Amino acid sequence: MLHIADKTFASHLFTGTGKFASSQLMVEAIRACGSQLVTLAMKRVDLRQHNDAILEPLIAAGVTLLPNTSGAKTAEEAIFAAHLAREALGTNWLKLEIHPDARWLLPDPIETLKAAETLVQQGFIVLPYCGADPVLCKRLEEVGCAAVMPLGAPIGSNQGLETRAMLEIIIQQATVPVVVDAGIGVPSHAAQALEMGADAVLVNTAIAVADDPVNMAKAFRLAVEAGLLARQSGPGSRSHFAHATSPLTGFLEASA
């Protein structure tokens, strides 16, 4: 089980809502992957209408909604969006995203830390999307973030765990859950993240743009389960040298 703030999740796979061909396909994929925490961009929903094409099926599915501030370029914009989300959806949970450059969508570390500290003080449960910077992740933890969400690679790039070395440090030193977010392109990437110690992964593009999103969602569910089970099973240590599994020395000597 995964514990974040005041909630417990059986699934270690979180999903997004962008890029799906239809709301129906989105919900089917979410159900197939078993995700219990789903992000949605505030700029994509009509907060005045709970029968919004994206919002209504998510509410009906019974998942925990994690509104995000995607599109915000400054701490002030993110804080404003956070308050709109809390008022409209009745949740203190927030995925904090601040990326000023639309080409690379890389998170702004200075604005993210600034916004996170303010939002925590205002009663939000903040899960910040951030670069794979161990120092920044520790600072975000220290100001009260409920989890940290370092990137594996740029959003939507499907490149996998390009920041693996830094992710390992973040995981080793964290005392809050670590959710690898962005860049995960295939199920094996998700399995690797769980194997190395991440508490969860957030996947959107890789599922939504697949030829068969529902089956891809199932594949990610199985990969996350496999990665977690592998870690819990205690994998053997790596070695630079070979270690025979079936020594033949005694047999050969006896036959000589």
From Swiss-Prot:
Keywords: Cytoplasm, Schiff base, Thiamine biosynthesis, Transferase. The active site is at K95 (schiff-base intermediate with dxp). It comes from the Bacteria. It is an enzyme of class 2 (transferase). It catalyses: [ThiS sulfur-carrier protein]-C-terminal-Gly-aminoethanethioate + 2-iminoacetate + 1-deoxy-D-xylulose 5-phosphate = [ThiS sulfur-carrier protein]-C-terminal Gly-Gly + 2-[(2R,5Z)-2-carboxy-4-methylthiazol-5(2H)-ylidene]ethyl phosphate + 2 H2O + H(+). Coiled coil: none annotated. GO terms for cellular component: cytoplasm. It is found in: Cytoplasm. 1-deoxy-D-xylulose 5-phosphate binds at G156, A182, G183, N204, T205. Pathway: Cofactor biosynthesis; thiamine diphosphate biosynthesis. Its EC number is 2.8.1.10. The keyword Transferase applies. InterPro entries: Aldolase_TIM (IPR013785), Thiazole_synthase_ThiG (IPR033983), ThiG (IPR008867). Catalyzes the rearrangement of 1-deoxy-D-xylulose 5-phosphate (DXP) to produce the thiazole phosphate moiety of thiamine. Sulfur is provided by the thiocarboxylate moiety of the carrier protein ThiS. In vitro, sulfur can be provided by H(2)S. Homotetramer. Forms heterodimers with either ThiH or ThiS. Belongs to the ThiG family. This is Thiazole synthase. It comes from Escherichia coli O81 (strain ED1a). The lineage of its organism: Bacteria, Pseudomonadati, Pseudomonadota, Gammaproteobacteria, Enterobacterales. The gene is thiG.
